[in-house]
């Protein structure tokens, strides 16, 4: 699937069918958080995807991603983009040992 997004003032509509994979779902959930009019169906029911859904719905200042590495990396970028938010991402003991310095 190739999608190119660029800034526009024109409203557009369309439909993208996804496989429901964890990888596609996680990426599209973050796009939906930025573009709230994006409607998603057939989202993965994986633990990692549920972790991202819960984090994006949370109003807490500390978000626990447990052992979801993709969630940690994607949410790091997302919360860095949201300058009005101060969120601390944490996770399992093993997650906190994994490298992320290059992203921050």
Across the structure, where does each feature detected by a protein language model lie?
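Structural preference for solvent-exposed beta-strand-turn elements
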Residues: 1-104
């Amino acid at each position: 699937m190739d999608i190119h997004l660029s800034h526009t003032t024109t409203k557009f509509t369309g439909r993208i069918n996804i496989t429901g994979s964890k990888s596609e779902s996680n990426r599209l959930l973050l796009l939906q958080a930025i573009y709230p009019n994006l409607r998603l169906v057939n989202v993965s029911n994986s633990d990692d995807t549920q972790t991202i859904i819960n984090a994006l719905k949370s109003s807490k200042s500390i978000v626990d991603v447990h052992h979801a590495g993709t969630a940690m990396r994607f949410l790091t970028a997302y919360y860095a983009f949201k300058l009005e938010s101060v969120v601390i991402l944490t996770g399992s003991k093993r997650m906190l040992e994994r490298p992320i310095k290059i992203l921050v």
